[in-house]
Amino acid sequence: QATETQLEPHEMVALAAQAQTSSGVSLTGSIDDAWACMSPGWKLVDVQAPVAEGVLMDEPSLPADDWTVLLVLRGPRTHQPTLEDFASQTTAFQQALMALQDANPLVALTWNGRGTVAALRDVEGRKMANDSFMNSARSAGISGSGPAIVIVVPSQQKPTVERIKSWYSTRYPEAEIIETSFLSSEIEDELE
């Protein structure tokens, strides 16, 4: 609003990516994350393509009212990954891609998390994600380059949500737990 300049979504994503890489926060500019924040739904993004052409798949979001998303923030990274760290985990990332192609983003989230935790050699992250499944989560995985854990639980299973929150706050008191949901189409309507 300050300049009254209207930007297209791909221009906003490009600006965000430039800020991420210039500050050293991200290896790739987090283009996929920026696209994910632009609108509800899940997207498959080619971070090597020009930003305006990089969204390969764009599908509707899972119903926001049906799912609770828990973010377990573990503090700053202890290891700064490189792109080479991820190369050895292509099988897990291919499984994530196949799950997206089958329109199953929760399975994709889990496979992506497995690939990431292996690439980072994050034993604690793997244990924490597995603990989520032991406590009845539907999906869980470490974030793109760590160290946060993303956990998805059916929202009608309130006791499960509370049990998982209690589990992490008891065993990992230094972690911050955020309860949220997927973006809904109503939010997209409000933004327009």
Feature annotation, model-predicted:
Residues 1-9, 38:
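DPxDG-like acidic metal-binding loop motif
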Residues 150-154:
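Short hydrophobic/aromatic beta-strand micro-patches
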Residues 146:
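Glycine-rich nucleotide-binding loop
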Residues 139-143:
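Short beta-strand
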Residues 11-133, 155-159, 163-192:
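ATP-dependent small-molecule kinase catalytic core of the GHMP/sugar-kinase superfamily
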